[in-house]
């Protein structure tokens, strides 16, 4: 059995503790033009969603199902959407990213894409659109005038 390399992050959980039944994709690879900055971005924003860094190597880092790799050419024009279990996690995702100096692509709020669609968007260092989404089924009749477009 392959042994995981020693991790450098303080935000690491035991991979055994992750609920692997939550997976819909096995994994997604994002190739980064600035590997260290991309790892900083994903670690910052995914911590707000309780998505852990579970393993890493010399030129890759795995956050459960997302692999960030120091590869060329960098991934571009990608839209990644991460599920949030609470509305507050969407707010925390956006706040953590903006607070760390990353660019917003849409503040937290309800969208008219679907009833109860509460989301926020950030650009990763390569310009990919990264979203956190909470499907607020208890608020499907939200005030349309408060909906962000």
Locate the predicted segments by residue:
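Core segments of cupin and vicinal oxygen chelate
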Residues: 29-67
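Vicinal oxygen chelate
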Residues: 32-36, 82-126
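Short beta->alpha transition motifs characteristic of CBS
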Residues: 28, 114-115, 121, 132-139
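Long, continuous compositionally biased terminal/linker segments
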Residues: 15-19, 64-100
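Glycine-rich acetyl-CoA-binding "A-motif" of GNAT/NAT acetyltransferases
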Residues: 129
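N-terminal beta-strand motif that seeds the catalytic metal site of vicinal oxygen chelate
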Residues: 7, 11-39, 80, 136-149
């Amino acid at each position: 059995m392959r042994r995981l390399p020693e991790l450098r992050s303080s935000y690491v959980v035991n991979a055994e503790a992750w609920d692997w039944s939550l997976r819909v994709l096995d994994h997604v690879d994002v190739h980064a033009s600035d590997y260290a900055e991309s790892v900083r971005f994903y670690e910052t924003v995914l911590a707000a969603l309780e998505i852990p860094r579970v393993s890493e190597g010399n030129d890759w880092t795995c956050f459960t199902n997302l692999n960030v790799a120091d590869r060329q050419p960098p991934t571009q024009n990608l839209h990644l959407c991460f599920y949030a279990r609470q509305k507050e996690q969407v707010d925390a995702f956006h706040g953590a990213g903006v607070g760390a100096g990353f660019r917003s692509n849409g503040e937290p709020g309800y969208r008219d894409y679907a009833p109860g669609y509460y989301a926020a968007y950030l650009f990763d260092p390569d310009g990919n659109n990264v979203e956190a989404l909470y499907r607020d089924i208890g608020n499907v009749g939200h005030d349309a005038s408060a909906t962000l477009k």
